[in-house]
Regions:
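STAS-typified acidic loop motif
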Residues: 5-33
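Hydrophobic "anchor" residues on beta-strands that sit immediately upstream
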Residues: 15, 47-49, 104
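Expand to "…catalyze enediolate/carbanion chemistry for C-C bond making/breaking, isomerization
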Residues: 32-41, 77, 110
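Short acidic-hydrophobic, aromatic-tinged amphipathic segments that line or gate anion-handling sites
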Residues: 101-112
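Intrinsically disordered or compositionally simple regulatory linkers and C-terminal tails
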Residues: 1-2, 118-119
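Amphipathic alpha-helical interaction surfaces in cytosolic regulatory modules
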Residues: 42-46, 50-99
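Short, conserved, surface-exposed binding loops centered on an aromatic residue
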Residues: 8-11, 38-42
Length: 119
């Protein structure tokens, strides 16, 4: 799968939005992590949103990668928000003990944008 088509990283002012649009392989997850960390460093980013709205299920590698990715981005400074966690994804993350300490969650992208403006 082409990462460019699968995982666009959009910048809107000081916000980065990553919308997953399909299943990613392990190499794609690693590239996404590198690309997002590079984009955070390019310019001052206040918020980074990982939108999982269309992801129904994640394997253990993807769950661990999301935890690592969100922690790495947050350590770089931006407030990290994970949006659109579907029931199957939430179940997998809980079963694997994957938690997102210090990371905000939102029902969907609109809710994430509201959190950025209204806290």
């Amino acid at each position: 799968m082409s990462l460019t088509a699968a995982v666009p990283i959009l910048r809107q002012g000081d916000i980065l939005i990553v919308t997953l649009q399909g299943d990613l392989g392990d190499a794609d997850w690693a590239k996404l992590t590198d690309d997002l960390l590079d984009r955070v460093a390019e310019r001052r980013t206040r918020f980074a949103v990982l939108d999982l709205s269309v992801v129904d299920v994640l394997d253990s590698f993807a769950c661990r990668t999301i935890v690592g990715l969100t922690n790495m981005v947050a350590l770089r400074g931006p407030t990290m928000i994970v949006a659109g966690i579907q029931p199957g994804v939430a179940f997998a993350m809980v079963q694997l003990g994957a938690t997102l300490p210090g990371v905000s969650t939102a029902l969907d992208l609109d809710h994430a944008l509201a959190l950025m403006t209204h806290g």
